[in-house]
Amino acid sequence: MDAVDAPRRPLSERLFADLLEAVLSGRYGPGDRLPPQRALAADAGVTMTSLREALKRLEQMGLIEVRHGAAMRVRDWRRHGGLDVIAHLLLTSGSLDRGVLSDVLEARTLMLGELAALAAQRRSPVQAQGLVALAGEIGRAADDAAAQRLDFAFFEQLAEAADNLVFVLILNSIRELYFAHAERLAVTARHRELAPLYGAAARAVTERDRGGARDAVTRLAALQRQRVEERLG
């Protein structure tokens, strides 16, 4: 589809993105009053319906407080924001924020290591077999892009084996962002060099070796972080 033919984002979505950036960048700081709704709608050239849709999304994210008959106020996103804020912080004004990305990759390494240890303790025989199969598929993947899809499937299976709902939901919440920017988040660049670590992790989980699983996945995630940083230069 040509750029000319690409569907335009709804007005409410564009306004939401503009207001969100204003809050996250500090243009509207914690405790600040937002302009009246009619003024915001007029300045943005949108209907009140579109404005209210945008404001509702910000309120649901915990970033503004809307009270009937009172001024709308900005909340401190560091205190009230959730995982859904990360994606917007990571891609500020369309460009990748290297500081936020570094934090994300650091947290990813820590999370996946503990996820592997739990999986080694709690996995079922079927889940262990699934991890071994996925590790083998990654080694045989035709290219890095195919390996990246398998990588996500491997960690989804690891989360299921860990039997921890929070880890499962975290992966669900980042899936869309992960694949939308897969080329920049090149965690499986030169995937055949990484393949032995998937195999080592799968074997450790199968053998219920918590320490071995944690070490293999931590080393894998650290190397993946290097791949991303190399790609970004």
Give the positions of each predicted feature.
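Short linear motifs at protein or domain termini
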Residues: 1-110
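Short, flexible helix-adjacent loops and helix caps
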Residues: 24, 28, 116, 120, ...
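Short loop-to-helix capping motifs
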Residues: 37, 163-165, 208-209
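Short amphipathic alpha-helical/adjacent loop interface patches that line ligand
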Residues: 37, 55, 135, 198, ...
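All-alpha effector-binding/dimerization core of bacterial HTH-type transcriptional repressors
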Residues: 79-157, 193-216
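Cytosolic histidine kinase catalytic core of two-component systems
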Residues: 126, 165-166
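C-terminal all-alpha effector/ligand-binding and dimerization domain
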Residues: 155-156, 169-233
